[in-house]
């Protein structure tokens, strides 16, 4: 009986099962595969306990405290019930969580370099990466957002979260430096506009078009704290958040004011560098324009001293004002006020000379009348020349006949003949010609 059992449990039939038995167990008569049920249950309990300890072990790294945000846990954004923007344009809980890729599709399909987020917004456990726009690539506001034609058909979770419109909003880049905040806030405002939240953005006067709702304020706060870590915020932004950590609207309003101020500064600098004056406009208006530009720049921290201002003004002078460039004896200590005194003096001299100069120019109407009268008077003269010629020709014939008859007549006085022949014949023509009898 034992031989049959040994033949059944031979190494040939059992292979690796018998090979794993130690040499100590081979000398015993106990079957190596005969394991009691109690030992099996103990092993199962031990393995279950080990697995439970691994899953419940807390993370080794503690989450640092965030002094400017409400909670380091991932933001929970309740979906709006009757919000002004559609459901697909608002982040859900998975979309606001950096570990959820359902809104953007698979990470490998994102055409941007992934970036590890700051741990202050990460919950303990497995973490994933979030897209970042590197500084070398940049995201200009003129670049259209990939809201259309960028569908991810391979992701089933994206289909469940989005509607049939298949529109995706491009997220803003991660803020990585306080100096990059002015450029970052431009992309964040663009992100809000693409999410149908342009009405809550403050306008030029600092007021939004409509009132923000509670759901929109939650969305605004959550997205701001995700994409703008507190350690990279400027000092003035931290001061606002220290008073009210949810006052994102005030941050946006101050940012827009700074953008307008920067734009005005750039325009003033360009205008001051391209000044042109030749006396065509009043000197008072030119002085007011220049002094206002200099005052605005000085108030915004861009100081323009008298030397630089005078050089910029004199470089744009032309005409009679151009010689002010060569007044070297006053260039060192000349002020803007002194330079404008010289400009006013030249302008007043120009105006006085223009007012005192007599006007010798004839009126155009008089010239037209003279030309018309000249044509009218010359016309009858041309017409009257023909009858004069005929009368002269007749008189010539008559005089010649009289001379010939007088020569034949014996009673004619020779002295009178010679006197008449030497007398010039007066012709009534235009050129006033004097013809003698021998010439015709």
Curated annotation (Swiss-Prot):
- On the tree of life, the source organism's domain of life is Eukaryota
GO molecular function annotations of the record: RNA binding
The annotated region (RNA-binding) lies at 299-401
Q: Which InterPro entries match?
A: TYA
Where in or outside the cell is it found? Cytoplasm
What does the record say about induction? Ty1-DR6 is a highly expressed element. Induced under amino acid starvation conditions by GCN4.
Q: Using the record's annotations, give every residue carrying the modification Phosphoserine.
A: 416
| Cleavage, annotated site positions | 401-402
Q: Give the Basic and acidic residues compositional bias ranges.
A: 429-440
Residue ranges annotated as compositionally biased, kind Low complexity, are 153-165, 402-418
* Cellular component GO terms held in the UniProt record: cytoplasm
One Pfam match, by short name? TYA
Compositional bias annotation for Polar residues: 1-23, 48-60, 127-152, 419-428
Q: Please list every transmembrane segment annotated in the UniProt record, as residue ranges.
A: none
Q: Which residue ranges are recorded for the region named Disordered?
A: 1-93, 126-174, 352-440
Swiss-Prot/TrEMBL keywords: Cytoplasm, Phosphoprotein, RNA-binding, Transposable element
| Coiled-coil segments on the chain, per record | none
What is one GO biological process annotated to this record? Answer: viral translational frameshifting
One further remark on this entry is: Retrotransposons are mobile genetic entities that are able to replicate via an RNA intermediate and a reverse transcription step. In contrast to retroviruses, retrotransposons are non-infectious, lack an envelope and remain intracellular. Ty1 retrotransposons belong to the copia elements (pseudoviridae).
* Function of the protein: Capsid protein (CA) is the structural component of the virus-like particle (VLP), forming the shell that encapsulates the retrotransposons dimeric RNA genome. The particles are assembled from trimer-clustered units and there are holes in the capsid shells that allow for the diffusion of macromolecules. CA also has nucleocapsid-like chaperone activity, promoting primer tRNA(i)-Met annealing to the multipartite primer-binding site (PBS), dimerization of Ty1 RNA and initiation of reverse transcription.
Give the domain note. The C-terminal RNA-binding region of CA is sufficient for all its nucleocapsid-like chaperone activities.
What is its quaternary makeup? Homotrimer.
Q: What is this protein called?
A: Transposon Ty1-DR6 Gag polyprotein
Species this protein is from: Saccharomyces cerevisiae (strain ATCC 204508 / S288c)
Q: What is the lineage of its organism?
A: Eukaryota, Fungi, Dikarya, Ascomycota, Saccharomycotina
Which gene name belongs to this protein?
A: TY1A-DR6
């Amino acid at each position: 009986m034992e031989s049959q059992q040994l033949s059944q449990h031979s190494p040939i039939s059992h292979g690796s099962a018998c090979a794993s038995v130690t040499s100590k167990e081979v000398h015993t008569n106990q079957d190596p595969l005969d394991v009691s049920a109690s030992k099996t249950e103990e092993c199962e309990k031990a393995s279950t306990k080990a697995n439970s300890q691994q899953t419940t072990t807390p993370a080794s790294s503690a989450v640092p405290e965030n002094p400017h945000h409400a909670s380091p846990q991932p933001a929970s954004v309740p979906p709006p019930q009757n919000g002004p923007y559609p459901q697909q344009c608002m982040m859900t809980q998975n979309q606001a969580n950096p570990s959820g890729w359902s809104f953007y599709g698979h990470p490998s399909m994102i055409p941007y370099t992934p970036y590890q987020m700051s741990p202050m917004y990460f919950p303990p456990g497995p973490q994933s990466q979030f897209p970042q726009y590197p500084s070398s690539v940049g995201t200009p506001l003129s670049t259209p957002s990939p809201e259309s034609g960028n569908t991810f058909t391979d992701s089933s979770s994206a289909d469940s979260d989005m509607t049939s419109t298949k529109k995706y909003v491009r997220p803003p880049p991660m803020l990585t430096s306080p100096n990059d905040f002015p450029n970052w806030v431009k992309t964040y405002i663009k992100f809000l506009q693409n999410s149908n939240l342009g009405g809550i953005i403050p306008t030029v006067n600092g007021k939004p078009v409509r009132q923000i709702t509670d759901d929109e304020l939650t969305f605004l706060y959550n997205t701001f704290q995700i994409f703008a870590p507190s350690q990279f915020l400027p000092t003035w932004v931290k001061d606002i958040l220290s008073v009210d950590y949810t006052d994102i609207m005030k941050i946006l309003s101050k940012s827009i004011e700074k953008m307008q101020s920067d734009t005005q500064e750039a325009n003033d600098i360009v205008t001051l560098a391209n000044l042109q004056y030749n006396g065509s406009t009043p000197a008072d208006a030119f002085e007011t324009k220049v002094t206002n530009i200099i005052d605005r720049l000085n108030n915004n921290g861009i100081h323009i001293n008298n030397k630089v201002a005078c050089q910029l003004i004199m470089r744009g002078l032309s005409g009679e004002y151009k010689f002010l460039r060569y007044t070297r004896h006053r260039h060192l200590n000349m002020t803007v006020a002194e330079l404008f005194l010289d400009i006013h003096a030249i302008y007043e001299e120009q105006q006085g000379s223009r007012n005192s100069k007599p006007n010798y120019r004839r009126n155009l109407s008089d010239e037209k009348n003279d030309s018309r009268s000249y044509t009218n008077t010359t016309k009858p003269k041309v017409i009257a020349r023909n009858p004069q010629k005929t009368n002269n020709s007749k008189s010539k014939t008559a005089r010649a006949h009289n001379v010939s008859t007088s020569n034949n007549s014996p009673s004619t006085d020779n002295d009178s003949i010679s006197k008449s022949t030497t007398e010039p014949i007066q012709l009534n023509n235009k050129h006033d010609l004097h013809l003698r009898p021998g010439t015709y």
